[in-house]
């Protein structure tokens, strides 16, 4: 094993090699800061950050960071939930106040900056918190802001703060100390499942390297290690015949907090498999530690990771992400570089794969060890679990994994695509016309298939959607709670004689994502892929449509894994709303049988044999002539059976009135589903987003004394009835993070406040400023969605699935929204069906 204190030196060497074309020997320059971020010192000495983030028009977040002052010692008495709710500000999941590694962070989210008086009040309020503390402090403002004007206001408000000397972030007291004694904890419970987790600790990135390429190298290696461990653990559990639920692999890095880095690998299994799962987990870690990975496995892992890195590089970070990055910079000296810097390093080919693999293996070897720097936890463990015996078993399994070589190939088989070779009759374009709503081009081919294409250059990827019509209502004898499993069956087939798991790996290593979406009346596949993989995507889709074969072992594994899962809260709410309705994507325990797979295969065969009934939507960084050429070459490989299928009528009878229950086994909170029959028109669709903001404001005001975070989501359905729904999730905030004027978190009293908010929200006065601000926010979100390739695909899938055009006049529809429309919508939703689930 490599001593951990040397692994950061190795990473620094790697960073030097990678950037050797621009970096003088023996130095690593600081990374360039994101151009959206401005940093400096106010006249009082407080550090400020302004971050331009246009993701939400008219909204911003403010944070105050008090270094080395824990929240228990911070002057939080001036934080008032009542005042903040009047400003239209509700707490996030962590509350208004949180302790971050011994420092206090005040975070005020979703502030309606479209109101000048709210902007000034919240800035003044934030500087009041600054003035009450003698700690070294920073103020962060991120959102739809004019950074110059915000800086002017901060200069004025800083005059009320006594001048202070603010030092740069530092951690002079940090010293890495290896822990030779493992730590074992067991937490028994009555749950039928148990969670086994292993956490390894390692030295953090040295302070002087936090804003250099070494931090990027360390983070990327950490991401790749997590990916490798997940992939291996899934396969090893499968080979051992151990059903599992969630595999949770996460980490705390050097920019997350000020102590050691931590990497956690956890798996949920049936309680009787606790010991066996722990052994597999130990053996998996030992294999990576002792023998490392092959260049092929490492290269494949990088390919699988590429979409994630690219998304971060081209997307706009959330305001919460901006706040966290600025907090890490102030507390630990972390980089403010844009994520494009990570992509720049990730894409460079300076090193041979074998050399980079060797560095990666050194990184993994330095982190993972047999019993050093280790915490072993059993949550929901059997009462009889012996911690000493489990530690012995872990050690024994680790020795076995270290000594006994494995014959398995752990790569993603990225080069094994030859089986997808297909010979297709050529087709021609029969007609071509502009798609009226989105500006794309609609091609109809001689075999009847239709394709809509819109080029959006520059991203290096394309998005796709294949809509095939005929949803769950076309499946005879479907059982309640069975429909949610149907879509998953598509991932359990062998394809073109490639085993199911290997085909999934092949898609992943090619950067091709494929998500199945089912509803009452439609079936869609959607995802994205690198631009250079368009031909591979078409060949994969043809193989999936025509050359599927049921894999019984994959079904058995999936079935056993699903037996450990519980219904999602969303599934539970919907099942309570429409008991007995079978055509939903709910997954209910005990409803998955061999008949489910047979129903799914018959259904998929009907859909894939009639490809002319659907439509393929493409948008992204593709050249039109190349797209045409490949479509004419490959679309003839799809089947276009001209026979028709009968359509089945579906009746829906949701409950009316209020149904309330107490349930257990979910995170504590109040979960509500509002449902009403309401025409799905363009006007109503956009009104739903504005009305949701009015509801959020009412909930924030009524819940201010009770300490709950608020999450809202709106949905609509066109089949079998036109309906709108609003899902409300309210979770209690940790008590240490609450203002002093929060009286109680009693869920019954909080629920009474929720019902009061629902009863009054439709009649509460709506100011012109709020209505204009909410409409502007909705307009900017819709426009940004339509301008993106993924939004283009989603928009057209929605249109062809629902036969509704809600986008062609979106600007006019949003502009026309008035207070009466908002009132009508809220009246309908709050007087319709209401499911309330209380989790104590």
Show which residues each predicted segment covers.
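Bacterial N-terminal signal peptides that target proteins for export
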Residues: 1-11
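Bacterial N-terminal signal peptides
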Residues: 11-20
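Proteolytic maturation boundary segments
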Residues: 24-52, 135-141, 145-219, 230, ...
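M16 family metallopeptidases and their MPP-like homologs
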Residues: 56-129, 134-142, 194-215, 233-354, ...
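Long, His/Glu/Asp-enriched segments that create or flank divalent metal/ion-associated functional microenvironments
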Residues: 218, 222, 226, 701
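Conserved short beta-strand edge segments in small beta-sheet-based binding/regulatory domains
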Residues: 550-557, 644
